[in-house]
C-alpha cells in the first residue's frame, strides 16, 4: 500500500515568534507547506516567506475558519491525497504527522482528529476543558460518530472531504462544521492521541461570542 501524498496547512495569526520553530520541524518538503496569514499585525507572513513556504495572505483578520477555507480552496485541485492541518503556536508536535497518515491509510479514514493528551506537568485551562467536553459531545451526537476532541486543530482531511464538503463558517466553529457535515455524509472519522503542551499563551477564542457561533452552527445544522 503506497504512502499518502499530503500537504500541510497552517492558519496563522500573529505567530511570528512560534511559526519558524513549527515550520522547521515539519517532515515534508517546503513546497508542500501552505501558511495562511489571517491578517496578522506582526511579521507572520514575512517570517513564513523567509522560511521558503507558500504564503497566502488575508487582507484582514477573518478568523481561523476563513483561513482554513482559503487554504482548502487553494489545495483542492492539487494532486494530494489529503491535508494535515496544524496550529501555528507550537502546541502540536509535527513529528506525529506520519502517524496521522498511517492511521488514515490503514483505517481507510477520511478524517483523523488528534485527541489531545496533556504532557506531564501541564494542564488544559478548566474553562477550555469544559467547553471542549461539551462541544465534543454535541458534535458526536450531530455527526453520528464518536469524536472526543472536536476542537483539536491537528487533524488529517482527505482530498475528497475538502473538495466535496462546502463550508460556510469563518471562525473556530469551522472545525466542528466539517466534522458534523462529514459524519452526516458518511465519511469515516477516526482519532489518535496527540501530545499537547500549553505554555500559557493567551487564546484568541472569545468565550461568549464563539459559544454563540457554535450554537448557531448547531441550530443551522439541525435544520439543514
Each predicted region: which residue ranges?
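Short beta-strand-to-loop acidic/aromatic patch adjacent to the donor-nucleotide binding site
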Residues: 80-89
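Short hydrophobic beta-strand elements that form part
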Residues: 7-11, 34, 57
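A conserved acidic beta->alpha catalytic loop
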Residues: 37-45, 90
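Cell-envelope/extracellular polymer assembly enzymes that use nucleotide-activated donors
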Residues: 5-7, 177
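Acidic helix N-cap motif at the loop->helix transition within catalytic regions
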Residues: 17-21, 42-51
Amino acid at each position: 500500500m503506497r504512502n499518502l501524498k499530503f500537504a500541510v496547512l497552517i492558519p496563522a495569526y500573529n505567530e511570528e515568534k512560534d511559526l519558524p520553530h513549527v515550520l522547521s520541524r515539519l517532515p515534508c518538503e517546503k513546497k508542500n507547506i501552505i501558511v495562511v496569514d489571517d491578517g496578522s499585525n506582526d511579521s507572520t507572513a514575512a517570517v513564513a516567506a523567509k522560511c521558503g513556504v507558500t504564503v497566502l495572505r488575508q487582507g484582514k483578520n477573518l478568523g481561523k475558519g476563513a483561513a482554513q477555507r482559503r487554504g482548502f480552496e487553494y489545495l483542492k485541485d492539487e494532486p494530494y491525497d489529503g491535508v494535515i492541518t496544524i496550529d501555528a503556536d507550537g502546541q502540536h508536535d509535527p513529528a506525529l504527522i506520519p502517524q496521522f497518515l498511517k492511521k488514515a491509510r490503514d483505517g481507510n479514514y477520511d478524517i483523523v482528529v488528534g485527541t489531545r493528551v496533556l504532557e506531564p506537568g501541564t494542564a488544559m485551562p478548566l474553562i477550555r476543558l469544559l467547553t471542549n467536553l461539551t462541544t465534543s459531545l454535541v458534535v458526536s451526537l450531530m455527526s453520528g460518530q464518536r469524536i472526543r476532541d472536536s476542537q483539536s486543530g491537528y487533524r488529517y482531511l482527505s482530498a475528497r472531504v475538502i473538495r466535496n464538503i462546502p463550508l460556510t463558517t469563518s471562525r473556530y466553529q469551522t472545525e466542528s462544521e466539517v466534522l458534523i457535515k462529514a459524519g452526516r455524509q458518511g465519511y469515516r472519522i477516526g482519532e489518535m492521541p496527540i501530545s499537547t503542551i500549553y505554555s500559557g499563551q493567551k487564546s484568541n477564542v472569545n468565550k461568549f461570542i464563539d459559544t454563540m457561533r457554535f450554537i448557531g452552527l448547531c441550530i443551522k445544522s439541525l435544520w439543514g
